[in-house]
Amino acid sequence: MKNHTDVLIFTQRFVSEQKQIAMMADEKSPARISHRRFATSCSEMRIIMQIKHFDTLPEDAVFIRKEVFVKEQGFKNEFDEKDNEAHFLVGYENGSPVATCRIFYDPAKSIYIFGRIAVLKPYRGTRLGSLLLTEAQSYVTAKNAAKIGISAQVRAAGFYETLGFVRQGEEYLEENCPHIYMEKTL
């Protein structure tokens, strides 16, 4: 018998095919609170993604954020004090880190904020970002969240709109990159 491990398997429709999704909660490992395996397909590609939760900033998230935000997009201030209090998700494909997201609670707005959402370039357009945010939403829903906020790059706002986020207010610049605040009511 596996100690402190629950497995639930169910089916969900992805890209017009039935795929299996396995959710596993592993309380045995302190760094890995839980993880899920998602299966999706894009054209001829089949990707299996495993999502792990962390209470401290993992090196795999640092790697992804440096690749996407620092090297690719030229941000200089990628890491901040929120990294000290946030919860992190990292998505793995065949054991390699490919996507990440951080989650923190903003008491001033009484809202959970998703941020530093990044998917490595070769994996964009494969629904891995959607799967990662679905898991992030499940995490905050379990904490009785009523709303989620995101400071989105304007070029990615359409992606977030497909997930139910709504633009709020005016665009603003973060490190010379246009952003828009978005919210989703749960």
Residue ranges and their predicted role:
Residues Y105-G115, R124, E174-H179:
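A conserved beta-turn-beta hairpin within the catalytic core of GNAT-like acetyltransferases
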Residues V140-Q153:
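Conserved GNAT acetyl-CoA-binding A-motif
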Residues G125-S138:
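Conserved acetyl-CoA-binding loop-helix of GNAT-fold acetyltransferases
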Residues R46-A61:
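A short beta-loop-alpha structural element at the N-terminal edge
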Residues G149-S151, E161, V166-Y181:
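Conserved catalytic-core motifs of GNAT/GCN5-like acyltransferases
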Residues I64-K76:
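Helix-loop element at the rim of GNAT/NAT acetyltransferase active sites that forms part
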